[in-house]
């Protein structure tokens, strides 16, 4: 009970801080043009239409308040990652639209790693018993696979990040239970999610620059789409290479779907 109360206290404090950041905005050019008061708040996008609207608002607002937009974006990203809240893919796309393809990619990789490590620490301090209570079978299966691959643990962690059937939120929550060293955990997230982050950020960069259908077929856009396609092939190639040479992976795909496992 004390652990749950501690977690709720931390969550409430972070939620309140993010609320203040998103509702106490300095008046920007777009807000001033619309004649809106300073109490305007921002929101987490839930679909592409909201994402595009938010991107337009923040890009205009960033002209006069670049540091504030950067702080707000980083805070929102770490909030979602730290508390394992779905929807970080929208923020990756937003990063590409706001900061461009390369700065956006660097920012997302760092924030993903820091946020996931924050989730690791929160789980270690407050959530171990909750995770074990709610997901006993998943924890047991993942524990078994971690022990089987303990001698090549870092490559196994990379595999779990690259493998699309493995839920990242569960890996973040269960890692301290499995005695995964925090340094290996951090760098496996930093490296393993580069392809995923690249695809999302490049998508945001493309969407932010399109003004017509003709722009979709420009050489710059075509090259970006080609780069996305090539990067999308990386996880499968790495999985095939490392799974054949170094890892014991017979049941890993069932971690997120225990009902798919066959009876022994």
Swiss-Prot record:
Xref: InterPro entries: TM41A/B, VTT_dom
Annotated signal peptide: 1-17
Keyword Ligase attributed: no
Membrane topology, as annotated: Multi-pass membrane protein
Pfam annotation, one family: VTT_dom
Domain of life from the UniProt record: Eukaryota
Subcellular location: Membrane
Keywords for the protein's UniProt record, in alphabetical order: Membrane, Signal, Transmembrane, Transmembrane helix
Transmembrane spans: 67-87, 100-122, 153-173, 175-195, 219-239
GO CC annotations on file: membrane
Comment block on domains: The VTT domain was previously called the SNARE-assoc domain. As there is no evidence that this domain associates with SNARE proteins, it was renamed as VMP1, TMEM41, and TVP38 (VTT) domain.
Family per similarity comment: Belongs to the TMEM41 family.
Protein name from the UniProt record: Transmembrane protein 41A
Species name: Mus musculus
């Amino acid at each position: 009970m004390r652990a749950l109360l501690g977690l709720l206290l931390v969550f409430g404090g972070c939620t309140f801080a993010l609320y203040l950041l998103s509702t106490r905005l300095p008046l920007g050019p777009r807000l001033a043009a619309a004649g809106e008061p300073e109490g305007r708040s921002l929101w987490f996008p839930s679909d592409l239409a909201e994402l595009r609207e938010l991107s337009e608002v923040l890009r205009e607002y960033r002209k006069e308040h670049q540091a504030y937009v950067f702080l707000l974006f980083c805070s929102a990203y770490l909030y979602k990652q730290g508390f394992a809240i779905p929807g970080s893919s929208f923020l990756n796309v937003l990063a590409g639209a706001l900061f461009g393809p390369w700065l956006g990619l660097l920012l997302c990789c760092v924030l993903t790693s820091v946020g996931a490590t924050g989730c690791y620490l929160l789980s270690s301090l407050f959530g171990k018993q909750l995770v074990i209570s709610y997901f006993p079978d998943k924890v047991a299966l993942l524990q078994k696979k971690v022990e089987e691959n303990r001698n090549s643990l870092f490559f196994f962690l990379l595999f779990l990040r690259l493998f699309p059937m493995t839920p990242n939120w569960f890996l973040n929550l269960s890692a301290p239970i499995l005695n995964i060293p925090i340094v290996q955990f951090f760098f496996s997230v930093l490296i393993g999610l580069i392809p995923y982050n690249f695809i999302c950020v490049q998508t945001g960069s493309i969407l932010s620059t399109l003004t017509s259908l003709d722009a979709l077929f420009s050489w710059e856009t075509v090259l970006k789409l080609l780069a996305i396609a090539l990067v999308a092939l990386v996880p499968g190639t790495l999985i095939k290479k490392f799974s054949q040479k170094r890892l014991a992976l017979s049941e890993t795909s069932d971690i997120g779907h225990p009902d798919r496992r066959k009876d022994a």
